[in-house]
Curated annotation (Swiss-Prot):
Protein name (database record): Diamine oxidase [copper-containing] 1, peroxisomal
Disulfide feature: C440-C466
Stored Pfam families: Cu_amine_oxid, Cu_amine_oxidN2, Cu_amine_oxidN3
Record-listed Cu cation binding positions: H555, H557, H721
Expression (tissue specificity): Mainly expressed in roots, and, to a lower extent, in leaves and stems.
Gene: DAO1
């Protein structure tokens, strides 16, 4: 379910910025004209050029200022120079202005006033363009200004005079008709109002999607809670449990999933979970410490009516737990630690990364940042600058596209707790405004995110994405034992992250980029357990007792990473394949007389049905995405390998109802041939979805070839959570993830050119730490007992 969070209403959409400032754009244009090819660029200093090129640069800047195109014969090194047709890169997230235009265009296109009044806006996102459009933008209009991305002809590069207009994709729910529709809007003149004109958008298409329910919105959750709390039979049920103050009651609406025809998407439904706080004057009290059970409520969310209600069983409220709270001064008897000294991260010369709009350069990495209400953070166009080999692509698009949380208790209400937190709700639209010094440390660049609310207004989550560098311990080291001489390098990584809250749980999503060419995907899980109440003396084996009358059910968390790979592939090329590697033990015999032999065996995954695979730690199984036409210095194909971390498969039986919608959980790895529209493993609309195996499990039935293709990896990774007492009242972070690691991609370690640490002191000694500064032991009997 969605959570209430602070958002900032966007300023007037006509002035909302979309992309980099004019000065940055001018520096970029100058750099493009100066013919800086595929190398790393310094946008603060225009590279030196000869007189002819300087004149060309001046002409380009003048043209940019006047917005008139250059003459066709204006060129540098044979490349025609064109002005920007737009100030937003084709992959930049929609600006607040663009969202406003898209909403206004769709609303104006409603056939009748009733249709327009019933429109509710679930999602407004960028319709990502074809990869050829991205290649054009990256070649001549935006960083990295890599003209080699474009196909060549006998007459030179073909360069259109402008980029095509951006488009928005809207999911619209009509509250009056219970219909869901998808609209495509072309954003022609978004910022015209700033120049005294009008906003303009053009409807390209609109289609009603039958038999679906879109994600439930935060406004619907809030209205649902109010409806339930005002329902007289519900209030009577609360009084029977000794609850007279309804302000203490928390109603968390959950999507119903699909268990039977009663959950069909012909109705928009929610089944709430109910909790009760203890204190009316404590806004940060842990209200999840007292679940209210035995009450069954079914809400028609379309009409905001309770259509089924039953007080089935009187389960006593769990007692107030003195250890339930987690705010400062209220934990473990009200005593906080006093021996934590400040730790400062200082970068006196600033960060090593450079930014232009949503384009990032760091060390030898470059990529773009995107953001959607459903996925949250998206990483586009990942590439590595590899010396004389230039900018080498690795991936087109990386994101987390779904997560599923099934619970293992067969009793009501826990058996129906099977949340699809991305598809039923949205990871991005539940993202936090991050705080410096709390969520991220160091020199930080934040990115805001713009969303539509339920009624079509624009809201902005400030500081939604955090970009910063981190020290990550040792990168490599060797000491010559003969001479005693040593070389050591410290590892630094660039981290891009966001954090979201979905009801009681928090999820933090990270993409880490390393100096050795490695990419790590990480999820950190924290927040509060979803608890259940017990009868006096009751014990339930499907969870952990937190205190008498209160227990935490076992459950699993599954995440789906979608990775459209592009290892050494330019846009338009489909030269990747996937091999599975298993380490095998050699049979005893002539080849293994010492009985010590083992070797890595590779198997090419030739088609989609063959590429449904599971992790196997006993054979060190991993998978390599290789380019079929590029080799390293040994003649082997270049590649990147997916290295699994800790993982699991669903523990529910094969007939479990939630697996109807989550058939993709049956394997850890799926590989598909890229196809537009195949974006979410459970299909576009998993909420109340009655269709078995929609999405990934259906797409692979085509069994498309993978031997040389545009490859999409779907990696499903999960964790089985058997709760501990130490997970209460708020869970310490659990880590889960995987790594993309170069495998024959480079000719040697790309980390050998990292310079030595500037503060490396061969005469090591304590940092002025004396015996007197050691913290004295605390002899607090209360702390000792706790």
């Amino acid at each position: 379910m969605a959570t209430t969070k602070q958002k900032v209403t966007a300023p007037s959409s006509s002035t909302a910025p979309c992309c980099p400032s004019t000065s940055i754009l001018r520096r970029e244009a100058t750099a493009a004209v100066a013919g800086v090819g595929d190398g790393l660029q310094n946008w603060n200093n225009v590279p030196s050029v000869d007189d002819k090129q300087k004149k060309t640069a001046s002409s380009a800047l003048a043209s940019l200022a006047s917005t008139e195109p250059l003459s066709s014969n204006t060129s540098t090194k044979g490349i025609q120079i064109m002005t920007r047709a737009q100030t937003c890169h084709p992959l930049d997230p929609l600006s607040a202005a663009e969202i406003s235009v898209a909403v206004a265009t769709v609303r104006a296109a409603g056939e009748t006033p009733e249709v327009r009044d019933g429109m509710r806006f679930i999602e407004v996102v960028l319709l990502e363009p074809d990869k050829s459009v991205v290649a054009l933008a990256d070649a001549y209009f935006f960083p990295p200004f890599q003209s080699s991305l474009m196909p060549r002809t006998k007459g030179g590069s073909l360069i259109p005079t402008k980029l095509p207009p951006r488009r928005a994709r809207l999911i619209v729910y009509n509250k009056k008709t219970n219909e869901t529709s998808i609209w495509i809007v072309e954003l022609n003149e978004v910022h015209a109002a700033a120049r005294g004109g009008h906003h303009r958008g053009k409807v390209i298409s609109s289609n009603v999607v039958p038999d679906v329910q879109p994600p439930i919105d935060a406004q619907e959750y809030a209205e649902c809670e109010a409806v339930v709390k005002s329902y007289p039979p519900f209030r009577d049920a609360m009084r029977r449990r000794g609850i007279d103050d309804l302000d203490l009651v928390m109603v968390d609406p959950w999507c119903v999933g699909y268990h039977s025809e009663a959950d069909a998407p012909s109705r928009r439904l929610a089944k709430p979970l109910v909790f009760c706080r203890t204190e009316s004057d404590c806004p940060m009290e842990n209200g999840y410490a007292r679940p209210v059970e035995g009450i069954y409520v079914l809400v028609d969310v379309q009409n905001m009516q309770i259509i089924e209600f039953e007080d089935r069983k009187l389960v006593p409220l769990p007692p107030a737990d003195p250890l339930r709270n987690y705010t400062a001064g209220e934990t473990r008897g009200g005593v906080d630690r006093s021996d934590v000294k400040p730790l400062h991260i200082i970068q006196p010369e600033g960060p090593s990364f450079r930014i232009s709009g949503n384009y990032i350069e760091w060390q030898k990495w470059n990529f773009r940042i995107g953001f959607t209400p459903r996925e949250g953070l998206v990483i586009h166009s990942v590439a590595y600058l590899d010396g004389s080999r230039g900018r080498r692509p690795i991936a087109h698009r990386l994101s987390f596209v779904e997560m599923v949380v099934p619970y293992g208790d067969p009793n009501d209400p826990h058996y129906r707790k099977n949340a699809f937190d991305a598809g039923e709700d949205g990871l991005g639209k539940n993202a936090h405004s991050l705080k410096r010094g709390c969520d991220c440390l160091g020199y930080i660049k934040y990115f805001d995110a713009h969303f539509t609310n339920f009624t079509g207004g624009v809201e902005t989550t400030e500081n939604c994405v955090c970009l910063h560098e981190e020290d990550h311990g040792m990168l490599w080291k060797h000491q010559d034992w003969r001479t005693g001489l040593a070389e050591v390098r410290r590892s630094r990584r660039l981290t891009v992250s966001f954090v979201c809250t979905v009801a009681n749980y928090e999820y933090a999503f990270y993409w880490h980029f390393y100096q050795d060419g490695k990419i790590e995907a990480e999820v950190k899980l924290t927040g509060i357990l979803s608890l259940g109440a017990l009868q006096p003396g009751e014990y339930r084996k499907y969870g952990t007792t937190i205190l008498p009358g209160l227990y935490a059910p076992v459950h699993q968390h599954f995440f789906v990473a979608r990775m459209n790979m592009a290892v050494d592939c330019k846009p338009g090329e489909a030269h990747n394949q996937v091999v599975e590697v298993n380490v095998k033990v050699e049979e005893p015999g002539k080849e293994n007389v010492h009985n010590n032999a083992f070797y890595a065996e590779e198997t090419l995954l030739r088609s989609e049905l063959q590429a449904m695979r599971d992790c196997d730690p006993f054979s060190a199984r991993h998978w390599i995405v290789r380019n079929t036409r590029t080799v390293n210095r040994t003649g082997q194909l270049t590649g990147y390998k997916l290295v699994p971390g800790p993982n699991c498969l669903p523990l529910a039986g094969p007939e479990a109802k939630f697996l109807r919608r989550a058939a993709f959980l049956k394997h850890n790895l799926w590989v598909t041939q890229y196809a537009p529209g195949e974006e979410f493993p459970g299909g576009e609309f998993p909420n109340q979805n009655p269709r078995v195996g929609e999405g990934l499990a259906s797409w692979v039935k085509q069994d498309r070839p993978l031997e040389e293709s545009d490859i999409v990896l779907w990696y499903i990774f999960g964790i089985t959570h058997v709760p501990r007492l130490e997970d209460w009242p708020v869970m310490p972070v659990e880590h889960i993830g995987f790594v993309l690691q170069p495998h024959g991609f480079f000719n040697c370690s790309p980390a050998v050119d990292v310079p030595p640490p500037s503060a490396c002191d061969s005469e090591s000694r304590d940092s002025d730490v004396t015996e007197t500064s050691v913290a004295k032991s605390t002899a607090t009997s209360l702390l000792a007992k706790l």
